[in-house]
């Protein structure tokens, strides 16, 4: 007999060589019917797994969050099965679960069309309703290679051939379809009920642009119809808020082929950019940061010394001049170390907080570029804190508080923290890592955050915090980071004189709040759906006259607003007032100042705020005071 421990703390005895499904059935038939996979000693397994030793067992159903990835992986196999039934000449390659869904890559001469997707989806529904049994099979590697070659699946054969000889190969069979997979999978295709195929895109075999182009079908799959409907509704809303669309409509920026991944900022977009920079500058000065500016083009010798040349060479723009190789900086940190090294630094100088709106360039693949979210030229709200080891906790707490203030001012209050600890390959002793990780954990807790652990995901040179925002439609955006670094000060020979008189290496904290200004503005456009708050809006007050004989007064009002630093626009054309109001509303201007005869006589304006039809009559001085008060909260 074996002892099986359950999540409720109970322990039950079963005969050896019992399957997880049989255990579930012994507990209750309803549990066995709903069961998808088993968690045995913390590892997910098929329900068909034979248990022959004492263990901890959890039976998982669609209600458990871990099963969402299983459903999506099952949906990927179901997609491939449907494609093979409909288009037998197609070769299958790989199909993993990803965030919010899955994809499967296919090799096929003829491109898949939108109509094809509808047919494939219908076939998937049919296969799901058949509730085909899914079985796991162990194969010899060489036999598996020969089998897949014999059925014309050369990509699959290539993958299997790359697996070391002697390793067992697991294949999963459902109906007439068989696929290489580690698993686990649910016991039948019927668990995949709530799904939708989204789009087709190109993808290179093995992600290498030198290889052939495949066709990638993206899909989404969920545990319930409500979850699927909610996700599709969110996508509809996201499409309306797409920053690329709103960027064009609101005349904020554009991109063009002659400068891929580089933003052409228009007047209104540049106003937002500068306002954010002004806001951040005020915050960092208040928090004891100095601001610096470092070169954009730097000799490769510095990048070699820092280690960036070895790791990021392919992502850097380089050029040859005067027998030298120069590179556009992809990040600011090595340049900040050069400033730190100017003159002797004492322990009394620490912590030294050095910030820069640093212009960086990264050679992103053209297919990866995506509006403001993924560009080649970007400005980071970057800063590096040079400190002693004993200052790490206090500096991290201060940073967390600053970051929280900033996010709150932009309307983000749901902030999640991910903590990435030591990877297998790393610099520094376990003792150094223990102290570093404990310092960050203590700081995060002091700052009032809970965190989720990303085991082994830290950089080789130190642990990391990532700060994730949730936007108005539930999407998550990783923006802020704090990365501890023991290595760069050593590589670039940065030091300070300790109280004892000995020379020590500072710890370097790389930190950013927004990430890049370009990406953060893209996030804000979508968060606000283009309706920027008054202090941030590119045009704060638009002036509209009812009749042309009021134009002189309108220009007086505009001058008074501009003289007080208020961003304005006006329409004194002969157009109807309703048309003017509608046009300014479409531009999402927060305040429209309507001027009629009565407003002129009383030196007033009638204010209509965006999204309302109510009007509030203010004197020009009162209007100026309202806007200035809002500006002064942030700027």
Curated annotation (Swiss-Prot):
Keywords from the named record: Aminoacyl-tRNA synthetase, ATP-binding, Cytoplasm, Ligase, Metal-binding, Nucleotide-binding, Protein biosynthesis, RNA-binding, tRNA-binding, Zinc
Pfam families linked to this entry: HGTP_anticodon, TGS, tRNA-synt_2b, tRNA_SAD
Gene Ontology BP terms: threonyl-tRNA aminoacylation
Annotated SUPFAM superfamilies: Class II aaRS ABD-related (SSF52954), Class II aaRS and biotin synthetases (SSF55681), TGS-like (SSF81271), ThrRS/AlaRS common domain (SSF55186)
Gene3D superfamilies with a match to the protein in the record: 3.10.20.30, 3.30.54.20, Anticodon-binding domain, Bira Bifunctional Protein, Domain 2, Threonyl-trna Synthetase, Chain A, domain 2
Domain TGS: 1-61
CDD domains associated with the record: TGS_ThrRS, ThrRS_anticodon, ThrRS_core
Gene transcribed to yield this protein: thrS
GO cellular component, one term: cytoplasm
Function: Catalyzes the attachment of threonine to tRNA(Thr) in a two-step reaction: L-threonine is first activated by ATP to form Thr-AMP and then transferred to the acceptor end of tRNA(Thr). Also edits incorrectly charged L-seryl-tRNA(Thr).
Catalytic activity: tRNA(Thr) + L-threonine + ATP = L-threonyl-tRNA(Thr) + AMP + diphosphate + H(+)
Family: Belongs to the class-II aminoacyl-tRNA synthetase family.
Cell location: Cytoplasm
Record's protein name: Threonine--tRNA ligase
The keyword Ribosomal protein is assigned to this record: no
EC assignment: 6.1.1.3
Cofactor: Zn(2+)
PANTHER family, per the entry: THREONINE--TRNA LIGASE, CHLOROPLASTIC_MITOCHONDRIAL 2, THREONINE-TRNA LIGASE
Originating organism: Rickettsia africae (strain ESF-5)
Positions of the UniProt region annotated as Catalytic: 242-533
Cofactor note: Binds 1 zinc ion per subunit.
Record-level Gene Ontology MF annotations: ATP binding; metal ion binding; threonine-tRNA ligase activity; tRNA binding
Complexes and interactors: Homodimer.
Class of this enzyme: ligase
């Amino acid at each position: 007999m074996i002892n099986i421990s359950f999540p409720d703390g109970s322990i039950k005895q079963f005969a050896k060589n019992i399957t997880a499904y049989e255990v579930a059935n012994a507990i209750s038939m309803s549990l066995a019917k709903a069961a998808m996979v088993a968690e045995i000693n913390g590892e997910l397994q098929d329900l068909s797994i034979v248990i022959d030793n004492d263990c901890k067992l959890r039976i998982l159903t669609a209600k458990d969050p871990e099963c969402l990835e299983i459903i999506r992986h099952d949906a990927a196999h179901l997609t491939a099965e449907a494609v093979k039934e409909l288009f037998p000449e197609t070769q299958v390659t790989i199909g993993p679960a990803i965030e919010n869904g899955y994809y499967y890559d296919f090799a096929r001469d003829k491109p898949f069309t939108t109509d094809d997707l509808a047919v494939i989806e219908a076939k998937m529904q049919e296969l799901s309703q058949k509730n085909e049994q899914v079985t796991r099979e162990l194969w010899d590697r060489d036999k598996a290679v020969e089998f897949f070659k014999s059925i014309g699946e050369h990509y699959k054969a290539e993958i299997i051939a790359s697996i070391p000889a002697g390793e067992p190969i697991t294949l999963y069979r459902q109906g007439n379809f068989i696929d290489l997979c580690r698993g686990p999978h649910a016991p039948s295709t019927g668990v995949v009920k709530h799904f939708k195929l989204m789009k087709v895109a190109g993808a290179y075999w093995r992600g290498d642009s030198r290889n052939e182009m495949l066709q990638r079908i993206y899909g989404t799959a969920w545990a319930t119809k409500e979850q699927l409907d909610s996700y599709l509704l969110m996508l509809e809303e996201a499409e309306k808020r797409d920053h690329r669309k709103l960027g064009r409509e609101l005349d904020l920026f554009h991109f063009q082929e002659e400068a891929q991944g580089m933003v052409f900022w228009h007047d209104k977009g540049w106003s937002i950019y500068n306002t954010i920079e002004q806001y951040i500058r005020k915050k960092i000065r208040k928090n004891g940061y100095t601001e610096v500016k470092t070169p954009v083009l730097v000799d490769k010798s510095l990048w070699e010394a820092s280690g960036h040349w070895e790791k990021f060479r392919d992502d850097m723009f380089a050029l040859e001049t005067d027998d030298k190789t120069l590179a556009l900086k992809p990040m600011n940190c090595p340049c900040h170390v050069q400033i730190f090294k100017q003159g002797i630094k004492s322990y009394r100088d620490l912590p030294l907080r050095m910030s820069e709106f640093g212009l960086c360039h990264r050679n992103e693949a053209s297919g990866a570029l995506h509006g403001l979210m993924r560009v080649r030229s970007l400005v980071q709200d970057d800063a590096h804190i040079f400190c002693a080891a004993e200052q790490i906790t206090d500096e991290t707490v201060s940073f967390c508080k600053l970051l929280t203030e900033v996010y709150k001012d932009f309307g983000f209050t749901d902030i999640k923290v991910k903590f990435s600890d030591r990877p297998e390959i790393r610099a520094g002793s376990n003792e150094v890592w223990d102290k570093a990780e404990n310092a960050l954990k203590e700081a995060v807790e002091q700052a009032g955050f809970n965190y989720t652990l990303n085991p082994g995901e830290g950089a080789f040179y130190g642990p990391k915090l990532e700060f994730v925002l949730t936007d108005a439609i539930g999407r998550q955006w990783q923006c802020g980071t704090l990365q501890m670094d023991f290595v760069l000060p050593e590589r670039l020979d940065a030091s300070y004189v300790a109280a004892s008189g000995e020379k020590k290496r500072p710890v370097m904290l790389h930190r950013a709040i927004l990430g890049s200004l370009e990406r953060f503005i893209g996030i804000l456009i979508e968060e606000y759906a283009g309706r920027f708050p008054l202090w941030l809006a590119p045009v704060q007050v638009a002036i509209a006259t009812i009749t042309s004989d009021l134009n002189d007064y309108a220009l007086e009002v505009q001058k008074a607003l501009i003289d007080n630093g208020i961003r304005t626009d006006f329409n004194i054309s002969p157009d109807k007032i309703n048309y003017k109001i509608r046009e300014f509303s479409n531009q999402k201007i927060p305040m429209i100042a309507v001027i009629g005869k009565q407003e002129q006589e009383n030196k007033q304006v009638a204010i209509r705020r965006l999204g309302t039809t109510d009007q509030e009559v203010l004197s020009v001085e009162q209007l100026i005071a309202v806007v200035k008060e809002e500006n002064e909260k942030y700027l």
